[in-house]
Amino acid sequence: MFETIIGLEVHCQLNTKTKIFCSCPTSFGDKANVHVCPTCLALPGALPVLNKEAVKKAIMFGTAVNATINKKSVFDRKNYFYPDLPKAYQISQFTIPIVEHGELFININGENKRIGITRAHLEEDAGKNTHEEGRSLVDLNRAGTPLLEIVSEPDMRSGDEAVAYLKKLHSILRFINISDANMQEGSFRCDVNVSIRPKGDEKLYTRVEIKNLNSFKFVQKAIEYEVARQIDAWEDGKYSELVVQETRLFDTSNFTTRSMRSKEDSAEYRYFPDPDLLTVEISDEMLEEARKIPELPNEKKERYINELGLKKDDAEVIISSYEHAKFFEDLINAGHEPKLCVTWLNVELNGRLKNGLTIEDSPIDSAKMSDLLSRIEDGTISQKAAKEVLDFIMENIEISVDDVIKKLGLKQVSDDATILAVIDAVISKNEQKVAEYRNGKDKLFGFFVGQVMKEGKGAFNPAKVNELLKQKL
């Protein structure tokens, strides 16, 4: 039996308007090499100037994970050569990072588990290489984008735990609004460090790094494959031959890993303090300001339970992502009843999102959902009819709620005179049951409601039917 040891390094792009050491914009998806300057290109004489906003966002993250904020930290040069790194070194923090000794908690099988965060340090992103047949192209728009590298302790023991940690971390970054953490665009990238050891053994064996994973699914699959590969090598007596300290790439076509290069030790990067940048000194005022972070996911959950009366399971679904929570908050801020919001967000809308779609991808936004809930609350349509409206809008996103109600003829009848005429007819047809009801057979009330709704072809407002029936009976 073997135990898996997993540690994660997450590179998170901070959502500052400009790069970490110059004033070039950080926008994504523009034409190649338009957001560059002498500093990005490492032209002689160009000097870096630290972006204060990036420092503030790093402090916010440290606060969110209960970490130590170093009031003095330094930038170092990490020396290596690659085409997308014009200076032939990366400005990073090695000796004294801005954030150390944090933690977050994940829920595994109903149990909370603490995952330590060793450090989080600021650094600049590299450019992007695109490889074509016979040539490689370099785009330096991304070069200099501020990164926060978040390094965990090797506290995870399975792919499930690693994914739970990443989802929790991703959620925190989004909720405190320091990164869009868009995995498809590369603003939330993960390196996985994996090793195995016999159960009960305290020794740490050879660690393999799997580079640049950009989806939770790929993290899970990469860990599963790599653990199986290392166990097979051990059991075949080839562990020292096949499992070496190296960086491996994950092949998304067949869910396997393959060797990329030998893994460097820190000494090989020849770190030394960057002489162009002063020591970062954080004032008490800046520290106090940066620590005023937005409400964290768990804090939202407690508020939803204690103040809005939500069930724990419902609250946990809502805080599962920033987009889900924002959608819910939009509905609450529009004045809708919390439990109605839960039903229509967690059950009705979620249930209609298929093929891996999330609330963020939903064709119906919070404003349109608010319109739908308003029509339920004011009695214009029944909840049953509202489901038809939602189904129609999911396929025809440009149409308004009121237009769908009109088009499908779903508006409820709430006119007293119309409903009373039907009630009188039902009572006249069922005089025996009326007598039984008035003699104490209360359960017959449901019968009368059903008969009135049937005669009204489901178009009557149920609340109004109940109210008028009670008066008549």
UniProtKB/Swiss-Prot annotation:
Superkingdom to which the source organism belongs: Bacteria
MF (Gene Ontology): asparaginyl-tRNA synthase (glutamine-hydrolyzing) activity; ATP binding; glutaminyl-tRNA synthase (glutamine-hydrolyzing) activity
Keyword Transferase: no
EC number in record: 6.3.5.-
GO biological process: glutaminyl-tRNAGln biosynthesis via transamidation; translation
Reactions the enzyme catalyzes: L-glutamyl-tRNA(Gln) + L-glutamine + ATP + H2O = L-glutaminyl-tRNA(Gln) + L-glutamate + ADP + phosphate + H(+); L-aspartyl-tRNA(Asn) + L-glutamine + ATP + H2O = L-asparaginyl-tRNA(Asn) + L-glutamate + ADP + phosphate + 2 H(+)
UniProt cross-references to SUPFAM superfamilies, sorted A to Z: GatB/YqeY motif, Glutamine synthetase/guanido kinase
Leader sequence residues: none
Pfam families, per database record: GatB_N, GatB_Yqey
Keywords: ATP-binding, Ligase, Nucleotide-binding, Protein biosynthesis
The keyword ATP-binding belongs to this UniProt entry's keyword annotation: yes
Family: Belongs to the GatB/GatE family. GatB subfamily.
Subunit record text: Heterotrimer of A, B and C subunits.
Function: Allows the formation of correctly charged Asn-tRNA(Asn) or Gln-tRNA(Gln) through the transamidation of misacylated Asp-tRNA(Asn) or Glu-tRNA(Gln) in organisms which lack either or both of asparaginyl-tRNA or glutaminyl-tRNA synthetases. The reaction takes place in the presence of glutamine and ATP through an activated phospho-Asp-tRNA(Asn) or phospho-Glu-tRNA(Gln).
Protein name, UniProt field: Aspartyl/glutamyl-tRNA(Asn/Gln) amidotransferase subunit B
Organism: Campylobacter hominis (strain ATCC BAA-381 / DSM 21671 / CCUG 45161 / LMG 19568 / NCTC 13146 / CH001A)
